């Protein structure tokens, strides 16, 4: 019988203690946050009587009958809160050279790091193992103390009790009970009504149109399953509130160096002719002008097309930043992307008190216009490529003239040793990166480019956090990073947070949002629902990652506190563990080995190459991270940073080495670490892997949107964007990472979170029943049949109850989320438009790609616009995606005309059944109405080829259907022939 050990306090590191009856001391019965009596008493004295984790109030009788069982040693501050020397390390500030070196390099190792503490770690590990053998009943506190290096004991200081040092940086604000309770009740009622509805539908077939009835029932069952997958992850939505002032009070004290964590920004671009350099420049400028310590910000721009235009535009951007950044910080302007700041139609003098503002703003606007002219000149020059290729200003050939065969390129702008702003202040570091490409190597598109940036940034700056942005998403809120740090740097909340996701907001969308480009329902409803479970999914941009989570590590384990009802019997009864998959056990052991290395080796210094490689077991790390000792050493530094004594030239060569085309071969890159390969929607796959490891994510919605971007408002471009997303979901469904079964044995992914991921991969398959269901109204009108038998009073009440429950669910969802009914209706319309076009094509293309090996190449959506406002909205571009919805529109319109004609011929009795069929057809037409408007364009004209193909398909379908008439039963045809014979007689 094993003795139950007391958990450790998450505030001071001491044992929590037990009550007189032997149960563990639990302060908060809602979340069981581990805190000892001494720390709890301090919280009460300071007037904060709420739980540090969940925010629920403590019970005042919690101190009764408690026996403290603490260690006699001094208080130990948890290592998670130690953000001193490692966070503030110099991030390769002396790099200012350009390097273009092929992948065949002789690595220069010899960085002086980590000697004394490795030896102390080894000694303590040996002592700990010997002590366990001699004294198996050693207390938990003594074992915990043995894991902490000696130097950390010497540097221990009592917890800071100044104002703001212990205040929580964020709180969870639950949805009011009056709103969420009624919402849940209606969901349960809708489930019950659905069960009764399907019982009626299945037990009351339509014999005269059995095929139509069966098709409709199958479609309705699929729609119900799809609704369950979408609805239940929204069961527990929450809101969050951050306190940036408390973050500053804790980590930015007057007269001291800022202790805020460093952040590496990733900006990706491929084709500068389709992703205008001016848009990318605005994104970069908004990053460089952030309200964040300049020595903590580094911006990496990935040019995956190796275009000289991208490089030259970045040179111009770095030069203009010397004027723009001090102007933004002096006058605290928002947003800090010049194109969008100067285009704002607001009173820009509001809240401005400096007399010089108007003059300097006018001068800055003139400078920006000159900057735009220079950028436009670069774009105009790049329209025609010289036969001999591009040449740089010094006369040498541009290394990236062959975009598929070129060396790796890195250029560092600005920063500590680079150019300063016009006021002489240091600017954030700006780095141009173009990874090596050679024929015969798989490059994995955007995911491969992001992984190359992960390695380059780890070698040069190694910030503990990474923020990735698309090139067309600029920073709209200069304090966005501080918002994320309120979660990630909180020692209580942020320990197991892998990333903070911000919602996507867009500029340049028409007021009616015809094609639901804003995705308001997804970002304001679904994502907030996921935040109440295990966190939102990763959506590809506007995300702040914890670097260690990208390296495949598991979150730090939390002490487990048993509930009071079971604590008394925990020594006698043990729960039988479920058998685990051997591959999962191996991966868990591998992660635990790496986690132990991080915990114990994260702060090592001054160690030679030979002994270091012996201690770290370098071979196993190389199989995971690749053949770079410098990069491997950076992965062991949990708080990031680069040693001061590192040779800058060595780092540049090493950075070139880690972006070589063959670096990822025989490693875990893209499989277990970094952005995950296997789908063109690498964002969903990457976030899914992190959640399967036990990490959680957080959804941050500041009042001022953190980031804003552009969206394709043209119908064809929008459908191609949706096609890409849907194809990625089909690829994940057909891969080994399918959420239906992947990670089930680990038990780290919560059930509702798994349902949400299942919904993200199966939604394209809804297109098959949706196309069939949208065709049924036309068939019913053309044949005179219907999918529902004559309704009784009870059946009518059932149908009415179903419609009311659907409406109530939507209304109550709008009530707690704040989404408008117009946004909800646009979302429903485009769900049908995308379902019968892009999703349908994605299903077939996905199966062809995954099963037959036929690859589908996607081009980057052009982000240029018409001179007129919303000019792109009215442009009609030919694509095969337009044919299915156009055909459905024509078929249903023909069916409505045929139905009214038939009713006129048959008389008064035919009008009653007609209304049900016409309502069914108009339901389809109303959902496709935005598509119809998009086809008409500004001049109300549709491409002739679309009209011809659609009319041809609709006509052939109608004629064949009337000729075959397959859903008329044989008894009907027999009776019809007999009647004809009687008439002849």
Swiss-Prot record:
Keyword Coiled coil annotated: yes
Any one cellular-component term (Gene Ontology): plasma membrane
Binding site for UDP-alpha-D-glucose: 268, 274-275, 304, 445
Keywords: Cell membrane, Cell wall biogenesis/degradation, Cellulose biosynthesis, Coiled coil, Glycoprotein, Glycosyltransferase, Lipoprotein, Manganese, Membrane, Metal-binding, Transferase, Transmembrane, Transmembrane helix, Zinc, Zinc-finger
Binding site for Zn(2+) 1: 9, 12, 36, 39
Name of the molecule in the record: Cellulose synthase A catalytic subunit 8 [UDP-forming]
Organism listed in the record: Arabidopsis thaliana
Extracellular side: 201-208, 789-793, 851-879, 933-941
Mutagenesis / variant outcome for changing residue 802 to F: In lew2-2; enhanced tolerance to drought, salt and osmotic stresses. Higher accumulation of abscisic acid (ABA), proline and soluble sugars
């Amino acid at each position: 019988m094993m003795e139950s050990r007391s958990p450790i306090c998450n505030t001071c590191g001491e044992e929590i203690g037990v009550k007189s009856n032997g149960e563990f001391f639990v302060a908060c019965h809602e979340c069981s946050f581990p805190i000892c009596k001494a720390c709890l008493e301090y919280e009460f004295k300071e007037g904060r009587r709420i739980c540090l984790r969940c925010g629920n109030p403590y019970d005042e009788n919690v101190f009764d009958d408690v026996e403290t069982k603490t260690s006699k040693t001094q208080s130990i501050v948890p290592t998670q809160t130690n953000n001193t020397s490692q966070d503030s390390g110099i991030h390769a500030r002396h790099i200012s050279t350009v390097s273009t070196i092929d992948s065949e390099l002789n690595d220069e190792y010899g960085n002086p790091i980590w000697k004394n503490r490795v030896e102390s770690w080894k000694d303590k590990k040996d002592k700990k193992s010997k002590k366990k053998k001699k004294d198996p009943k050693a207390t938990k506190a003594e074992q915990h103390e043995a894991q902490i290096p000696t130097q950390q004991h010497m540097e221990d200081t009592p917890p800071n009790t100044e104002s703001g040092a212990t205040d929580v940086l964020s709180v969870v604000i639950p949805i009011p009970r009056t709103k969420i309770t009624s919402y849940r009740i209606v969901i349960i009622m809708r489930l019950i009504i659905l069960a009764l509805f399907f019982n009626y539908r299945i037990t009351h077939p339509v014999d005269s149109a059995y095929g139509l009835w069966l098709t409709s029932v199958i479609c309705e069952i699929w729609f119900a399953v799809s609704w369950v997958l979408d609805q239940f992850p929204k069961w527990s939505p929450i809101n969050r509130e951050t306190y940036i002032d408390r973050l500053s009070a804790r980590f930015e004290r007057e007269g001291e160096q800022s202790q805020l964590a460093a952040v590496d920004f990733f900006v990706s671009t491929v084709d500068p002719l389709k992703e205008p350099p001016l848009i990318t420049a605005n994104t970069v400028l908004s990053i460089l002008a952030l309200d964040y310590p300049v020595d903590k910000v580094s911006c990496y721009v990935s040019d995956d097309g190796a275009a000289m235009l991208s490089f030259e535009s970045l040179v111009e951007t770095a030069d203009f930043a010397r004027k723009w950044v001090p102007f933004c910080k002096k006058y605290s302007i928002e947003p800090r992307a010049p194109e969008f700041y100067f285009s704002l139609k607001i009173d820009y003098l509001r809240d401005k008190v400096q007399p010089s503002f108007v003059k300097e703003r006018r001068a800055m606007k003139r400078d920006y216009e000159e900057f735009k002219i220079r950028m436009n000149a670069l774009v105009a020059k790049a329209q025609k490529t010289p036969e001999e290729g591009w040449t740089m200003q010094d006369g040498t050939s541009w290394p990236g003239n062959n975009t598929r065969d070129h060396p790796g390129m890195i250029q560092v702008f600005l920063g500590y040793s680079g150019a300063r702003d016009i006021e002489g202040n240091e600017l954030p570091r700006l780095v141009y990166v173009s990874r090596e490409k050679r024929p015969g190597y798989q490059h994995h598109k955007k995911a491969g480019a992001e992984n190359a940036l992960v390695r380059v940034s780890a070698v040069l700056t190694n910030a503990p956090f990474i923020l990735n942005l698309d090139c067309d998403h600029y920073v709209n809120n200069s304090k966005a990073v501080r918002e994320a740090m309120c979660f990630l740097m909180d020692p209580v909340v942020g320990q197991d947070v892998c990333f903070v996701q911000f919602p996507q907001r867009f500029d340049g969308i028409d007021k009616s949002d015809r094609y639901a480009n804003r995705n308001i329902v997804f970002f304001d409803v679904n994502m907030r629902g996921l935040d109440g479970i295990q966190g939102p999914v990763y959506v590809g941009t506007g995300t702040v990652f914890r670097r260690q989570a990208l390296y495949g590590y598991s979150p730090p384990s939390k002490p487990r506190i048993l509930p009071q009802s079971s604590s008394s019997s925990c020594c006698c009864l043990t729960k039988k563990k479920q058998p685990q998959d051997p591959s999962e056990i191996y991966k868990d052991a591998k992660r635990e080995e790496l986690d132990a290395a991080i915990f114990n080796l994260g702060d090592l210094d001054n160690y030679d190459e030979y002994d270091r490689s012996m201690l770290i077991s370098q071979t196993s790390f190389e199989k995971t991270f690749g053949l770079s000792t410098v990069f491997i050493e950076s992965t062991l530094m949990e708080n990031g940073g680069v040693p001061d004594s590192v040779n800058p030239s060595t780092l540049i060569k090493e950075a070139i080495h880690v972006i070589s085309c063959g670096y990822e071969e025989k490693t875990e890159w893209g499989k277990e670490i970094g952005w995950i390969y296997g789908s063109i929607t690498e964002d969903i796959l990457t976030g899914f892997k992190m959640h399967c490891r036990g990490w959680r994510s957080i959804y941050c919605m500041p009042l001022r949107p953190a980031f804003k971007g552009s969206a394709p408002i043209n119908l064809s471009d929008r459908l191609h964007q949706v096609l890409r997303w849907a194809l990625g979901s089909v690829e994940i469904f057909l891969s080994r990472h399918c959420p239906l079964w992947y990670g089930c044995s680990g038990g780290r992914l919560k059930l509702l979170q798994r349902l949400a991921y299942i919904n993200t991969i199966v939604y394209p398959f809804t297109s098959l029943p949706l196309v069939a269901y949208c065709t049924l109204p036309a068939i019913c009108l053309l044949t005179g049949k219907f999918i529902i038998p004559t309704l009784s009073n009870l059946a009518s009440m059932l149908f009415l109850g179903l419609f009311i429950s659907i409406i109530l669910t939507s209304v109550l969802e709008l009530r707690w989320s704040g989404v408008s009914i117009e946004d909800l209706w646009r979302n429903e319309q485009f769900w049908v438009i995308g379902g019968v076009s892009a999703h349908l094509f994605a299903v077939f293309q996905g199966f062809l790609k995954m099963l037959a090996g036929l690859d589908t190449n996607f081009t980057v959506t052009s982000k240029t616009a018409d001179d007129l406002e919303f000019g792109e909205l009215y442009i009609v571009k030919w694509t095969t995606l337009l044919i299915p919805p156009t055909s459905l529109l024509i078929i249903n319109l023909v069916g409505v005309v045929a139905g009214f004609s038939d009713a006129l011929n048959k008389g008064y009795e035919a009008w009653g059944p007609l209304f049900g069929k016409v309502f069914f057809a108009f339901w389809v037409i109303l959902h496709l109405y935005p598509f119809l408007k998009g086809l008409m364009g500004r001049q109300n004209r549709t491409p002739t080829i679309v009209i011809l193909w659609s009319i041809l398909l609709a006509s052939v379908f109608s004629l064949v259907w009337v000729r075959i008439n397959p859903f008329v039963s044989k008894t009907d045809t027999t009776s019809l022939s007999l009647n004809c014979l009687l008439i002849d007689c």
